[in-house]
């Protein structure tokens, strides 16, 4: 085994550990006796002024001032909850998710993620967009106040802006738009199905992800 405890070891690890972390880090590497006293734990960060209900799990992510996060919610690795954003209960923010914040003007609307929603990895939701209860947002979806959120499940498309309806399953898409230089594809979001409201939430979510092959 290689003992850790010097500054060089910290550079190799890329992060620091606290004294209460189990001594085994990875096969072949263990902390030297007393080394934990020299190291500092780096957990997720909730800034002073944020409110997290009991039972919130924050991986190495960040919750900014004024944000509200409900019980049972997971803020996964490198996910960011912006200032004054409102995250409901039992929400899952996957790795790298960006939830936009707003401090001013005071009349601006914060991003709201309602209870039970699932936000896939690297999704970005900003400018006061609201995600309805138990909606599923696929990986890499970008939602702004002006993003066209197009329901393509019926014979005619239905366009939403600023709000994802409850239990909607959303993936990235594009639509044609004419410019002086020609016609180009611009980003949009597509509602491709509905998460069942009549079955257990967890079972329903897993089935939706399979049925629609939604990347998360």
Locate predicted features.
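Solvent-exposed, flexible loop/coil residues
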Residues: 25, 29, 35, 43, ...
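Residue-identity detector for glutamine
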Residues: 12, 24, 37-38, 86, ...
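Terminal amphipathic alpha-helical/low-complexity segments used for targeting or macromolecular assembly
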Residues: 40, 161, 167-168, 172-216
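Structural signal for interior beta-strand "rungs" in well-ordered beta-sheet cores
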Residues: 46-178, 191
